[in-house]
Design a protein with these regions (language model features):
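Extended acidic low-complexity intrinsically disordered regions
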Residues: 1-11
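Short, surface-exposed, charged amphipathic helix/loop patches that serve as local interaction elements
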Residues: 23-114
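Short acidic-hydrophobic surface loop/beta-edge motif
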Residues: 11-22
Length: 114
């Protein structure tokens, strides 16, 4: 007897976020590439230090990484680190909250698969 795995019937989990622009843009985030996950895990412990020191290069790298993660979405919306700071009015504390929430989301997905 043949078995059928129909990917059209699989519900893909997303983390839905609402950005702080005037339109309150809603974005449905998907699981990112493995490389982005590794980068996020690598920088997470350093984020509070960046907040304390205000190191501009580290701030820029963090905003750019978060922008690449947010750009992994079902909506086809692409954002940059500069847009997160300006258009979407995200300060660094919001970036930390986002990263923490996003890592929780990834852990839930990973645990659900096991």
């Amino acid at each position: 007897m043949a078995r059928l795995l129909d990917f059209n019937n699989i519900e893909v989990q997303t983390l839905d976020i609402v950005l702080r622009d005037d339109a309150r843009t809603k974005v449905h985030l998907r699981y990112p590439t493995e490389g982005l996950v590794q980068e996020l895990i690598r920088i997470s412990p350093e984020m509070h230090k960046v907040l304390e020191t205000g190191d501009e290069e580290s701030l820029n790298l963090t905003y750019d990484l978060v922008a690449r993660i947010i750009s992994c979405n079902r909506d086809g919306i692409k954002v940059t680190g500069d847009e997160l700071r300006n258009k979407y009015k995200m300060d660094f504390e919001m970036i930390i909250v986002f990263c923490s929430t996003y890592l929780d989301f990834l852990n839930e997905l990973t645990n659900a698969k096991n």
